[in-house]
Amino acid sequence: IFTKKKSRLITTDPCFPMYKVYSEINQNKLIFIKYNKNFTLDLKDFYKKINNKIDAIIIANPNSPVGDLIQEKDLIKIIKKSNKYGIPFFIDQAYFEFSKTDMIQLVKKFDNVIISRTFSKGMGAAGIRLAYIIANYKIIKLFENVRPLYEINQIAVRYGLFLIKNYSLAKNYCVKTIISRDKLCKIFEKNKIIVINSKTNSI
């Protein structure tokens, strides 16, 4: 929808591996934002790399496999600059249930923000391959124009509806995971083992 052959995309390194795969398939050029030695994203470099030659930006927030989370105030600065150039800004929130953050308000503030979420992580339903996007009306219409004829099977629909109606089951699972994750991080720190305070379901 937003890219073509030789389009330039910004993402982080490391990132979700499929970003690279799909970029290669579409013959796009990926521009990577690296992490510093203390495992924090170089936000100054991120801001600097945004210009009128960039066609799209995609980040995972929280990011797996690193586990870090870009704070909303820092994210807004980057989004504002990308919006100035009309650059679509994708936020992959596959792990948002484990971060206690919600970026939906950014869709209301900026018309270039697209949020994707999945039932695979916090919902524990990777096998049904069910996900969704949150964006403004104009962007949703663009996605509707390229929807495949057979996109979601009936098993995925039924199980997805079950999980929505019984969201407390998934929420309890996420809470237990967060408690265990944070407890393990403290044990590592106590034993002087360097660890990133992850905001995903892993360390």
Predicted regions and their residues:
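Phosphate-binding glycine-rich loop
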Residues: 1-8
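PLP-dependent aminotransferase class I/II
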Residues: 112-188, 194-196
